[in-house]
Amino acid sequence: MISCENIHEVFKKNGIEYFTGVPDSILKEWINYVVDNEDKIVHRIAANEGAAIGHVVGYYLSTDKVGVVYMQNSGLGNAVNPLTSLADSDVFGIPMLLMIGWRGEPGKNDAPQHKKMGKVMLPLLDVLGIPYEILNDEDMSEQIKNAKEKAKKEDTPVALIVKKGFFSGYIAKKKEGDILGLCREEAIHTVVDTFNGDEIVVATTGKISRELSEYRQARGQKHDKDFYVVGSMGHACAIAMEIACQRPEKKVYLFDGDGALMMHTGTMATIGYYAPENLFHI
C-alpha cells in the first residue's frame, strides 16, 4: 500500500498542485489528505465529473499547468462528453491526469451497480483514446512522472487507475460540524413513521437507500413500493418526478442527498415546470 503523504510528494515533485473531482470510496484516504492540505495546494470539489473536467481545463488554460481530476469509474460516463469534445487531442488538446477509482474490478466482489463499468472501463478508455496506467506500489512514482510527461507531450488526458486497497489508512484532521442536530438516519425514520403504507418511495444512491431498507426491515415493513436507486447518482429526482406525473393519485416521496442533487441540479427546473403536487422531495 502507498501512503497518502508519499503520493502527494510525488505529485508535488512533478509540479502537480491542482486537484478537482467527485469523492470516491477507493480514493477516500487520499482525498481526505488533499482536503487537510488545501492551504498548500488548489482543491476544487466539483458538482459532477464533467464539471471537474471543465475546472481542470480552465486551470490549464490560465496557468499552462497539468491538473488532476479524481473520480470513481462509475462517474466516467459523466466526463465522456467534455473529454471527447473539449479535452481530446483532436479538439483543444488539454493535458490532464484522471485519477480513477476502480469499482467493480473483474474477479473482485462488489455491488451489482459497479459490475458493468468495472468490466468495460479499460476498453472504454481504449475507445476514447485515453492512455492509462494501473498504479502499483513499486512503480507508482515513475508511473505518475511518465503519465504527466505523456499528457504534456501528446496534449491528451492520461488516466491513473487505482485499485481498492491501494492507499494505506489516513484519518482526516478536518471534521464537519453538526449543523442541524438531526442526522440523516433520524430524518428518514421521522418521515417514514408518518407513512400509512400506500406511498411510493424513491431513495437516492448510497447510504440513504441502505438506511431506508434497513429501517423497513427493522419494522417488519414491505419494500414493494420502494425503489432504491443504487447507481446513477443524481438521477433519483428525475425518476421520482416521472413516477409522480404518471401516478397522480399516489403520494410519491423522494429521499435525496445533497451531493446527488447538486450533481444534476438542472432537473429541479424540470420538476418546477411540471410541478407534480403529489411529489414530496426530501
Map each language-model feature to its residues.
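Short acidic/glycine-rich loop or secondary-structure boundary segments that cap or lie
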Residues: 210-212, 262-265
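Thiamine diphosphate
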Residues: 1-241, 245-251
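A short alpha/beta connector and helix-capping loop motif
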Residues: 84, 93-96, 263-282
